[in-house]
Amino acid sequence: MSRHNKGQVIVPTGGGKTMCMIHDAIEQFKSGSLKTVVVVAPRILLANQLSEEFLEFIKDVDVLHVHSGETHHTSTTNSQKIEEWHWKSKRHQLIFTTYHSLHKIQKATAMLPDTVYFDEAHNAVQKNFVEAVEHHSMYVLRNYFFTATPKHSLTPFKIGMNDTDIFGQVICNVKAPKLVRQGYILPPKVKIKKFDILEDKEDVAERDSQHLLETLDDNNINKSLICARSTKQIVRLFTDSDFALGLENRGYSWMFITAKTGGVINGKKVDRETFFNTLNSWGQDPHRRFVVAHHSILSEGINVKGLEAVLFMRKMDFIGISQSIGRVI
């Protein structure tokens, strides 16, 4: 990154992409002139997580969050207020935002970042995001695109990460087998379980419950992530079947989170901060057995400590599968 002002960093999940950003930001902040660094994430949850990780290593900076989520840091999605914050600041600046809100920084025309890190950059090719991405790629001096799963396009009518004018060349490409050999990540093991065809009037939630409990029993899994088809499937699994009771009888705790329901722990609704604090606490507890169910919130970039397996209850594309597996390797 010290040799390139723009480029793609392709590293498998768990390979240290965030530390690459943090180390580069530390080097930038050694400059005599004040620097503004923007970190872009696909989700508010990941933006908040990245903020915590950066600030473990970087002190004495001003921090702004540009998204609609909750944070104890200064936060706004108003472009004029972004400009005012920028010009009032007397220190180096870290701005954490989402692809959804990146255009708010674009419209803050009285400021220009020095460096932008695009995390989970395969999201940057989406048509509702790419205009703001292209703007920063064109006008910001340093742009870096980090992902484990680059998304390319075979047609000139659709943007892909093979558009080097926007995304630059690949400046780093680390292969997963290398990280496995060196002990940084574990090789995933795939096991397939066949579902029986439903009989007439058979309860779908009960069938799902039976198969999930059998899978946990057969594989002796202590901490598992369940990828469900929908919020409805998750809610029915825990309310219309004996799944929760079966888990409790086996010594498991349980939790789920969706955009519609928010976080739920052992049947009790909690705020997101409590949910993720509990999730990470359980993940680090060697004696705790639990399952956590979701649709997509936990897929990309979210660090969940201690997970041993992911159970797929729906079809997913290559990127979705890769990102989900990345939570446990």
Identify the function of each model-found stretch.
Residues 168-235:
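Conserved interdomain linker/interface between the two RecA-like ATPase lobes of SF2 helicase motors
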Residues 74-115, 127, 297:
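Conserved helix/coil segment N-terminal to the catalytic DExD/H
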Residues 259-329:
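Conserved RecA-like P-loop NTPase helicase motor core
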Residues 231-258:
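Conserved helicase motor "Helicase C" RecA-like lobe of SF1/SF2 P-loop NTPases
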Residues 4-24:
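Walker A/P-loop
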Residues 45-76, 245-246:
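Conserved helix-turn-beta segment of the N-terminal RecA-like "Helicase ATP-binding" lobe
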Residues 18-20, 33-56, 229-234:
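Conserved Walker A/P-loop ATP-binding site and its immediately adjacent core
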Residues 122-185:
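Post-DEXD/H (motif II) to motif III coupling segment of the RecA-like Helicase ATP-binding lobe
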